[in-house]
UniProtKB/Swiss-Prot annotation:
Domain of life: Eukaryota
Pfam family, one: Ank_2
A single cellular component GO annotation: stereocilium
Biased composition (Polar residues): 286-297
Region Disordered: start-end pairs: 272-320, 607-627, 766-785
Subcellular location: Cell membrane; Cell projection, Stereocilium
Function field: Component of the stereocilia rootlet in hair cells of inner ear. Bridges the apical plasma membrane with the lower rootlet and maintains normal distribution of TRIOBP, thereby reinforcing stereocilia insertion points and organizing rootlets for hearing with long-term resilience.
Gene3D superfamilies, sorted: Ankyrin repeat-containing domain
Protein name, as recorded: Ankyrin repeat domain-containing protein 24
InterPro entries to which the protein is assigned, alphabetical: Ankyrin_rpt (IPR002110), Ankyrin_rpt-contain_sf (IPR036770), RAI14/UACA (IPR042420)
Single Gene Ontology BP annotation: sensory perception of sound
Listed GO MF terms: actin binding
Length: 1146
């Protein structure tokens, strides 16, 4: 019963009609069904009233006071569901809000839509502070609801001791009766609230009041199997001799419950002297009025039959094991209820503190899906149980046939007069008992043997079932371990992070190399195009060629991209053969995740080529070799598994590396080899491994991916796994069919042997009769000897057939196990198919996302290339501008000289050559040129050696003279160039910022996807843990159900055997009465004692079974206090059906 968990609703503790319909058959339930809500539709219910209701829900007393004062709201106004803020405060225990509403003049006697007022709700949900406030506000303490219950009835049903004390302190009526005639003491006794019963009795409640069916509190306490409550009621003056309307007293209810301690208490109370007057405790006016009402109720209900006599012998228990077990169960129930309440309060606090997150909804959906899966598994297990029952029925038929055959043999033994197994059988035979007495004694012996054998068979079946359950749980654990390889994922993630770090270091080294090479490229402007072409030639194909658009340069590397898929398949086969041959290196020597080898005709050549290429890689490319060693070490750490598992790991590793390397942006250089940096492929095409002189290119080799490869081996591996599973399932089914055919053939052979044995037994019986007839006339010792020898031979044959039947039972058990294993294999196959489908979908989704990311990365790379080319052009323009700016000081000097000359000439030619306005304009331009020249001089100082070289050129050009118009033209051109350069620089800055933002966005999306994946893994782990918990709970429930079913079957069988034994004992007694007195030997007395012991054992077993059912029934009564979910209702309904079936069997 540990799986029965009562889940309470904090909002309303009221049973639904389905729960009330599943109550035990003990009469009408003491908890009244609430009246139907009228749903009073208030016409003026508005948003302000809803705000008031929400404030009470949040226990916000200042807001409640403000709303009532400002808006003039009425707290007792009912909403469309029939509840108000005033009643909600009493139900939730919001004492401060209730005090505010009472202070504003609320009607404390108003009822809600169900007919409850605030006093009833506060007592029902156990809020003594609210009760005290309402009673101090002149609320009537004994007001009844629509079912006739007072506040004390509700407090007694809920078991709230403090609420009952408050009501008693305000002089509440202690013995009010509801419509069914139940008093608070009767309800508290039925709910087994011992402390509450003690309080009511101390306050003066009538202990012997009866309801309309004539039941007292003592009867209901006995029915609930609560010895503590019975003891308190007996100490309070309860009389055990009172009978109900059916004439049953408390001892009858105690006998039905099967509690020995209760029967002992009742017996002690019956032995004590009764009080002189039964009405001494009813002297007060209240008690007399209640007794008069009880008497009227008893007169109105006619008695149908007299009370049956109490049990003839009430057992006196030597120990209190049963009582201690019940006390322990009650304490455990209290702890569980307290824990459930604490968890619910914690959950409500968390809901109030923060709203539910989306992950919680996802987890709830996963839990619901797991519960649905659990229900499906339960249905499959029930179908297995039905098949097991059918096999057990077949076995029972075989056992019946075997018993019939053994019965024929025993009758033959009885007719001959041999009793070899019982003590004193030879003495009885020598004294020549009558045939009827011998027959009865032999039948008793056979019954004892059958009972012993059945007990042994039941123990063997229980052992088989336990072994089957252990195997099932072990297979489930192994299946879970095969489905989700988390260690593989962690190792691949570590390798992916390491490759990403290496890629980042290579990019950083490349940038540093580019910054060091910038001055070299500025040395010769005419050779820039040649250097760029040489760099492109050395670095191999471009990024577009890496993504699959093949250029003629890709064929130089030794493997065309057209043959990528075929080469990938051959690589996988080579890795598989290499792993089978060596067993140490699982995935071969992979430099990166996407590596395509040259196409070879055989697998051996592929292995040799990979070995050669690995050695060349280790010699020529240290960075790639380091990556290879890291990956090989990471794969070898996981261990060498099966070939298919290795292939899947290799594919997943390649996929992970490809996805990881596709994210970072690529610099201006491209990869040297698109199909894997291998030295052998380079030598085959005439390209030397040492021909690459650019160290920046070598640094980028391990970080550049080979484009989008979708790994066709994953689908092939999944198909192979599915085909293998289907072949295994077919093989299991074929083996099961073969076993079934063999078992059927063996059963037919056993049936034929049984028929032959029956025919032989008939012949022997006829021969025995003939021998008896001949013995009666003249008798012959030789025939008797032959008959005995034939009987011995028949016994041997029957023993052989018995052993054969046992072998058949073992074979049937093996068949059951095989069928169960087949079903488990089918379940595993279905789970694996679903898992493969999910993995395939996830892989396709990830491949689509990877394609999108790669396209985005390709566009980003193209944009980056364009920006780099634009930056190179801008750099060249900047160099030209700097060169021109370096020429400005000489031009400025010349301008100064020209200005001086112009000043001199202006004095002479002021009227004829240059006007005054033009002179002022030239002076202003000269001033601007001076400021600009000063800034340019500062830049010239920073340039260093190049400025000195340019000054030398300027010195050579100073010899030439420049005219004024030429000077103005040069100045205008320089100004336009400077403005154009500034605009280009601003545009370049904007593009750089945009590119940086896009790169940052891509990185952030990658990190977000990583965090989401980790969260999904954590959620999957929690869901798996919850699934394991649900599976264990379902297994426990199934075990409890199977134990209860076995106990019920045993009880039925024992009842039948008891009836048969009683009949046989009766016949034996009759036969013994017919015998002379001299036959009463000690052996017969010993047999009688054995018969009595067997009967007593069977009676004790029946009583134990009835006590178990009564214990389940008491737990059902305890669960009435809370809301039961569907699982608990189903389990309790099964228990009730078992009890009804037992009653029908009796």
């Amino acid at each position: 019963m540990k799986t029965l968990r009562a889940r309470f609703k904090k909002t309303e503790l009221r049973l639904s009609p389905t729960d009330l319909g599943s109550c035990p058959p003990c009469g009408p339930c003491p908890i009244p069904k609430p009246a139907a809500r009228g749903r009073r539709q208030s016409q003026d219910w508005g948003k302000s009233d809803e705000r008031l209701l929400q404030a009470v829900e949040n226990n916000d007393a200042p807001r409640v006071a403000a709303l009532i004062a400002r808006k003039g709201l009425v707290p007792t106004k009912l909403d469309p569901e029939g509840k108000s803020a005033f009643h909600l405060a009493a139900m939730r225990g919001a004492a401060s809000c209730l005090e505010v509403m009472i202070a504003h003049g609320s009607n404390v006697m108003s009822a809600d839509g169900a007919g409850y007022n605030a006093l009833h709700l506060a007592a029902k949900y156990g809020h003594p502070q609210c009760l005290k406030q309402l009673l101090q506000a002149s609320c009537v303490v004994d007001v009844v609801d629509s079912s006739g219950w007072t506040a004390l009835h509700h407090a007694a049903a809920g078991g709230c001791l403090s609420c009952s004390e408050v009501l008693c302190s305000f002089k509440a009526h202690l013995n009010p009766q509801d419509r069914s005639g139940a008093t608070p003491l009767i309800i508290a006794a039925q709910m087994c609230h011992t402390d509450l019963c003690r309080l009511l009795l101390q306050q003066g409640a009538a202990a012997n009041d009866q309801d309309l069916q004539g039941r007292t509190a003592l009867m209901l306490a006995c029915e609930g199997a609560s010895p503590e409550t019975v003891e308190v009621l007996l100490q309070g003056g309860a009389q055990p001799g009172i009978t109900d309307a059916l004439g049953q007293d408390a001892a009858h209810y105690g006998a039905l419950a099967g509690d020995k301690l209760i029967l002992h208490l009742l017996q002690e109370a019956a032995q004590r002297p009764s009080p002189p007057s039964a009405l001494t405790e009813d002297d007060s006016g209240e008690a007399s009025s209640q007794n008069s009402m009880s008497s009227h109720g008893k007169q109105g209900a006619p008695k149908k039959r007299k009370a049956p006599p109490p049990p003839a012998s009430i057992p006196m228990p030597d120990d209190r094991d049963a009582y201690e077990e019940i006390v322990r169960l009650r304490q455990e129930r209290g702890r569980l209820l307290q824990k459930i309440r604490g968890l619910e309060q914690h959950k409500e606090r968390r809901q109030q503190e923060s709203p539910e997150a989306s992950s919680l909804h996802i987890l709830e959906r996963q839990v619901q899906e797991l519960q649905q899966l659990l229900v499906e598994r339960q249905e499959e297990k029930e179908s297995l149980g039905r098949e097991v029952e059918s096999l057990q029925s077949r076995l029972s038929l075989l056992e019946n046939e075997r018993e019939n055959t053994s019965y024929d043999v025993t009758t033959l033994q009885d007719e001959e007069g041999e009793l070899p197994d019982l003590p004193g059988a030879e003495v009885l035979l020598s004294r020549q008992l009558s045939p009827s007495a011998q027959e009865h004694l032999a039948s008793l012996q056979e019954q004892v043997a059958v009972l012993t054998r059945q007990n042994q068979e039941l123990m063997e079946k229980v052992q088989i079932l336990e072994n089957f359950e252990k195997d099932e749980t072990q297979m489930e654990v192994e299946a879970l371990a095969e489905v989700i390889p988390l260690a593989l994922y962690d190792s691949l993630r570590a390798e992916f992070d390491q490759l990403r770090r290496q890629h980042a270091e290579a990019l950083q080294a490349l940038r540093q190399q580019e910054t060091r090479e910038v001055p070299r490229e500025e040395g010769a402007a005419c050779g820039e195009s040649e250097v760029a072409g040489a760099t492109a030639t050395k670095n191999g194909p471009t990024h577009m060629e890496l993504n699959g658009s093949v250029a003629p340069e890709t064929k130089v590397n030794g493997a065309e991209t057209i043959d990528e898929e075929a080469a990938g398949d051959e690589t996988m086969e080579a890795r598989t053969m290499e792993a089978e041959a060596t067993g140490a290196e699982a995935t071969g020597a992979e430099a990166t995740g996407a590596k395509v080898t040259e196409t070879k005709p055989t697998g051996a050549e592929v292995r040799e080529m990979e070995t050669t290429e690995e050695e060349a890689n280790m010699e020529t490319k240290p960075t790639g070799a380091q990556a290879t060693d890291t990956e090989t070490t990471g794969v070898e750490a996981m261990g060498v598994e099966a070939t298919k598992t290795k292939a899947e790991e290799a594919e997943m590793q390649a996929y992970g590396v490809g996805a990881g390397q596709a994210e970072p942006p690529v610099t201006g250089t491209t990869n040297m080899e698109a199909t894997g940096s291998r030295a052998t492929g380079m030598e085959s095409t005439g390209v030397s491994a040492t021909g690459v002189e650019n160290p920046g290119v070598e640094a980028t080799v391990p970080g550049i991916s080979a484009g989008p490869i979708l790994h066709p081996g994953a689908a092939e591996a999944s198909e192979k796994l599915q085909v293998e599973l289907e072949t295994r399932i077919r093989g299991l089914e074929e083996a099961l069919r073969q076993r079934e055919r063999e078992a059927a053939a063996e059963l037919e052979a056993a049936l034929g042997k049984c028929e032959a044995a029956e025919a032989e037994a008939g012949r022997l019986r006829e021969r025995v009769r003939e021998a008896e007839g001949s013995g009666a006339s003249g008798g012959g010792g030789g025939d008797t000897t032959q008959l005995r020898a034939a009987l011995e031979q028949a016994r041997e044959d029957l023993r052989d057939r018995d052993s054969r039947l046992r072998e058949l039972e073992a074979a049937s058990a093996c068949l059951d196990e095989a069928r169960a294993s087949r079903l488990l294999a089918e379940e595993e196959a279905r789970g694996l198919r679903a898992e493969l489908a999910q993995r395939e979908e996830a892989r396709l989704e990830q491949s689509r996302e990877l394609e999108v990311l790669r396209e985005q990365l390709a566009t980003a790379r193209a944009t980056g290339e364009q920006q780099r080319t634009a930056a190179a052009e801008l750099g060249r323009a900047r160099d030209a501008a700097e060169a021109r700016v370096a020429e400005l000081p000489a031009a400025c000097e010349e301008a100064r000289q020209g200005l001086a000359e112009l000043r001199e000439a202006s004095e002479a030619l002021r009227q004829s050559v240059v006007p005054a306005s033009e002179h002022r304009r030239l002076q202003e331009e000269a001033l601007e040129l001076r400021g600009r020249a000063a800034s340019l001089e500062q830049e010239v100082v920073a340039t260093g050696k190049e400025a000195a070289r340019l000054r030398a050129e300027l010195e050579r050009e100073r010899v030439c003279s420049v005219a004024l118009s030429e000077h103005e033209r040069i100045v205008g051109t320089l100004q336009a160039n400077v403005a154009q350069l500034e605009g280009q620089l601003e545009e370049l800055g904007r593009r750089h910022e945009k590119t940086s933002a896009e790169v940052f966005q891509v990185q952030r999306e990658a990190l977000f996807m990583k965090s989401e994946r980790h969260a999904a893994e954590a959620q999957l782990a929690t869901a798996e843990q919850q699934l394991r918990g649900l599976r264990t709970e379902a297994e426990r429930a199934r075990q409890a159900q199977s134990r209860a079913q076995e106990a019920l079957d045993k009880a039925k069988e024992k009842d039948k055997k008891i009836t048969e034994l009683s009949k046989e004992v009766f016949n034996l007694k009759e036969a013994l009465k017919e015998q002379p007195a001299a036959l009463a030997t000690p052996e017969v007395e010993a047999l009688r004692d054995q018969v009595k012991d067997l009967q007593q054992q069977l009676q004790e077993a029946a009583r134990d079974h009835s006590s178990v059912v009564a214990l389940y029934r008491s737990h059902l009564l305890y669960a009435i206090q809370g809301q039961m979910d569907e699982d608990v209702q189903r389990i309790l309904s099964q228990i009730l059906q078992m009890q009804r079936l037992q009653a029908q069997g009796r």
